[in-house]
């Protein structure tokens, strides 16, 4: 409860608790739904402030309301409120993961991600095999928010998903963890024979993820890709070269900088361009004094 109940007398706390519990009963939640339907003249921040005061007895009714609402703004408000109300009640959300409405399942995964507790991981993992790709994508985002070694392990498995966007999202979320344990699977992918066949967005995501980890351990592989002569079409080879250079610039250590400076002075035009681009990009993102 968000109120400072230590400032109140016992009888006041009892009345206040009873009021909040009654506010979470289904008829009251239905009234909130009718208010939200109007939208015009409704102060959403006030509705949100009211909802986050509710207790876990309101969760099922709020989820029912969430399933019925069509407007994105309203659904987001309900999801965010449920993320607060349900912090210690994950078990009340999990039955809805079996719902036939994919959009509701996606919303439940969104909520579990924002609650951010490791105990939700087995349920988020189930979302990674859902037939609807949008549910799987939400599962990847949730893993990134929950974090930890178990979530990272699930993200590694998702690097081989059939959907390229999910593979890219998995890579980025692995990079955000900054864990060296995440680096090896990322490096394995960029060195694979299949990697040059991937789309531009996916290639860029993997190199960005490697750069996020920020470890010198990536430098030998990145240097090899940066300086490699390729039999692939020039455009694809340049994409990989630029990606490797950008990752090196993100790592930003003296060792990485030395390789980029050497590449900038190279007579190989493609190598020179990649290193120059990476250094300029790095400089543009650095704060000015």
Model-inferred region functions:
Residues 13, 43-44, 75, 105, ...:
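Residue-level detector of extended alpha-helical repeat arrays and alpha-solenoid scaffolds
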Residues 54-58, 77, 85-89, 106-107, ...:
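Alpha-solenoid helical repeat scaffolds
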């Amino acid at each position: 409860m968000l109120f400072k109940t230590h400032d109140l007398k016992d009888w006041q706390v009892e009345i206040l608790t009873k009021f909040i519990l009654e506010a979470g009963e289904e008829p009251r939640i239905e009234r909130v739904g009718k208010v939200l339907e109007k939208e015009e003249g409704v102060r959403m921040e006030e509705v949100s402030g009211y909802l986050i005061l509710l207790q876990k007895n309101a969760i099922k009714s709020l989820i029912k309301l969430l399933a019925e609402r069509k407007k994105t703004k309203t659904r987001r408000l309900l999801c965010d409120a449920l993320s607060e109300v349900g912090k210690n009640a994950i078990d009340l959300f999990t039955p809805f993961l079996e719902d036939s409405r994919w959009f509701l399942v996606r919303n439940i995964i969104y909520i579990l991600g924002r609650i951010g507790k490791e105990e939700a991981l087995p349920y988020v993992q189930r979302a990674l095999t859902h037939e609807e790709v949008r549910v799987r994508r939400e599962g990847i985002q949730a893993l990134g928010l929950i974090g930890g070694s178990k979530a990272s392990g699930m993200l590694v498995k998702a690097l081989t998903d059939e959907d390229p966007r999910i593979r890219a999202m998995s890579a980025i979320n692995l990079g955000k963890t900054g864990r060296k344990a995440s680096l090896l699977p990322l490096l394995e992918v960029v060195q694979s024979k299949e990697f040059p066949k991937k789309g531009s967005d996916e290639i860029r995501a993997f190199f960005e993820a490697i750069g996020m980890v920020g470890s010198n351990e990536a430098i030998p592989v990145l240097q090899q890709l940066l300086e490699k002569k390729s039999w692939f079409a020039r455009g694809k080879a340049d994409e990989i070269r630029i990606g490797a250079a950008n990752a090196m610039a993100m790592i930003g250590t003296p060792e990485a900088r030395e390789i980029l400076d050497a590449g900038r002075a190279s007579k190989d035009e493609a190598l020179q361009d990649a290193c120059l681009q990476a250094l300029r990009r790095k400089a543009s993102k650095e704060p000015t004094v």
